[in-house]
Amino acid sequence: MRGDIMNIEQVATNFTYEQLASALYLKGELDGFPKVTDKTKWREPVMADKLGHIAHEKISAGAGKDEYGSDAFDPSKEKYAEYKSQAIVEKQLNNLFERSRGKRNYVPLKVTGVYNGAYKQEALDAYKDVDHYFGVFYKEQCVLVINPNTDEVMRQLEYNNANRKEGKTTNLNTVTIDLKDEMLYTVAYKNEEFYIDNIEE
């Protein structure tokens, strides 16, 4: 992995933002994902690869389609999957690893998934029938993916919907999973090498 990091650092040094973004865009086209640089779409094939899923080519499927309310297909379960992701910064690694801070440890990380448009009954109904996966990215490297219980995801979405004030945005319906609440999720993927390299820092 350290050799990979050195190679990535060399690429980052030698190429401009525009060149790197263009390369990512072209990589998406070659792999069948048009406009992969839109709305962190590129994270979806990354998560799908970690989970053994097949990511949808388009950013979102329209209402009425089987894949509506999902980002990928899980062939092992023959079920659709919805992906959410968040980027964390260095200080949040303290929470991810629950590192020591004197006599106590840092509180566990809270992982969030933002559901835009999840204030429509049609969208809420679609989310009931798919699996949900929340990815955690550090420096755009996928370090953890959790699979929250669908019942808990729906409980929070429906609660937020019921308490939305009139006229407020129908976007940003946020589900939060505290990693200390292990009964609410399972770990679907963990970058073990990243954990070994960073957990004690």
Regions inferred by a protein language model and the residue ranges of each:
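Nucleic-acid endonuclease domains
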Residues: 2-79, 83-201
